[in-house]
Amino acid sequence: MKFHIITLGCPKNTVDSEGMHGILTREGHTAVDSSDGADVVIVNTCSFINAAREETVGVLQELANNKAPGQKLIAAGCMAESHGDVLRSRVPKLDATLSTKEWMRIGSVVAGGVAPSKTTGFGIPLMGGAPSAMPSTGLNLSLTPAATGDSLGAYGDWRTTAITRNKRGPSAYLKISDGCNLRCAFCTIPSFKGDMRSKAVGSILGEARELVEAGVQEIILVAQHLTDYGRDLGMKQNGLGVLLEELAAVVPADRWIRLMYAYPQSVTPDLVETMARLPQLCHYVDMPLQHAHPDTLRRMRRPPDTDKTKAIVNSLRQAMPDLSLRTTFIVGYPGETRDEFKALLEFLEEMQFDRVGMFRYSLEPGTVAGELPDQVAERVKERRWNEAMAVQQVISRARTARFVGQTMKVLVEGTGTDDDGRAIVVGRSYRDAPEVDGLVFGYGAADVGQFAKIAINKTTDYDLWGEIV
């Protein structure tokens, strides 16, 4: 069969989509670049907040409305797990939903390994009629054989299994764990991802070797709680540091390893030292902090000790003076007073983060935060978001301007010409994670997927400009 996978949401979903791609290609199916002409279309869904769920439904509805005769449509992943009944109700032309815990069975679903009673010809229960006995899946998984293995090791757990990598482009995400042991008041993820499970070091190294052999220049480590890696494997407090040492023996010194989603309270002195010492490690950390006022943080069920957070940030900057630090904050959280918001603005000014993702609080049914009193009005959220972004824009502009006169190592991701016909490349420096950060533009020629040196002579709020040297 020909299949096409559409991935919505975070990089962790990208990794799971690669896993499904690997399973299907190993079983003889063929990937195609468009839903047109595909026998099976798989959408790896997102359920992070309501806006993400609405986007998921919209994508599925459009695909359903344009289904070719005989074409099958599968919703996989987070929203299939958390709101499978909603998907089946709003997208009745869905042929199956496959939860986060079952994506390894995608081969059996596509092959139609289910008994024929009350099924379509595709081998899955019809979506109409009475509600399914398994509300998060439209497939009777008891009738579908469990995945028994993959190219890198025995299948043990849906979150910890190594996957065959489908290399697309010079960068690749590598998920080292899934699930989360934290219970932040605003977050639904543990309710459908479960507690954290770390992938075995050997499995991670196997994936990394495959990516290196495929020519990937940048490996981006992702997890729900990156810095807690290995705790469930008995690695205590420095599991991530131990893993990085092992990865450094696999990834050449001239390539990049990037860390995303590092929880601040789990950053140890040993980890800081390891990051500063290993040449592969980008001096970059994405460290979601969410707020800066102790009272707000307590309501969020986050560590309220902002002094400790400052000490951790300072230790990272002392070890790596060129560190690029990204974080995220939520404004308009229930009960956020003007004084609490002012504390956040002061924190931005004091800490001088390179990049900030600012989010307006989104009420999620079923969360502790959703039941809190003093929900903040939408107009107040919008005003505070604009105010905070204005403060951070000035900071980001100044942080970026420091690089004028420097020569940056840039991973080239595209080439073209400007309005005058001059050759130009676009890529990212160590300061820039894919999609969420800035870009580097350089006049001259270079190969896509390789590193180039660009002498910086101009900056904007978030981007760098220069000449290839």
Curated annotation (Swiss-Prot):
- Cofactor binding note of this UniProt entry: Binds 2 [4Fe-4S] clusters. One cluster is coordinated with 3 cysteines and an exchangeable S-adenosyl-L-methionine.
One GO cellular component term noted in the UniProt record for this chain: cytosol
Name the SMART domains on file. Answer: Elp3 (SM00729)
- Chief site of localization: cytoplasm
Record's InterPro entries?
Answer: Elp3/MiaA/NifB-like_rSAM, Methylthiotransferase, Methylthiotransferase_CS, Methylthiotransferase_N, Methylthiotransferase_N_sf, MoaA_NifB_PqqE_Fe-S-bd_CS, NA-bd_OB-fold, Ribosomal_uS12_MeSTrfase_RimO
Q: What class of enzyme is it?
A: transferase
Q: Does Cytoplasm show up as a keyword for this record?
A: yes
Where it sits in the cell: the answer is: Cytoplasm
Q: What UniProt keywords are attached to this protein's entry? A: 4Fe-4S, Cytoplasm, Iron, Iron-sulfur, Metal-binding, S-adenosyl-L-methionine, Transferase
Cofactor(s) this protein requires? [4Fe-4S] cluster
Instruction: Identify the residues that the record assigns to the Radical SAM core domain, covering every copy.
Output: 166-398
All copies of the MTTase N-terminal domain together span 1-115
Domain of life, source organism: Bacteria
Q: Which GO terms describe its molecular function?
A: 4 iron, 4 sulfur cluster binding; aspartic acid methylthiotransferase activity; metal ion binding; protein methylthiotransferase activity
Question: Record's family?
Answer: Belongs to the methylthiotransferase family. RimO subfamily.
NCBIfam families per record: 30S ribosomal protein S12 methylthiotransferase RimO, MiaB/RimO family radical SAM methylthiotransferase
Q: What does this protein do?
A: Catalyzes the methylthiolation of an aspartic acid residue of ribosomal protein uS12.
Would you tell me the protein name for this molecule? Ribosomal protein uS12 methylthiotransferase RimO
Species assigned in the record:
Herpetosiphon aurantiacus (strain ATCC 23779 / DSM 785 / 114-95)
Taxon lineage: Bacteria, Bacillati, Chloroflexota, Chloroflexia, Herpetosiphonales
Query: Which gene does this sequence derive from?
Result: rimO
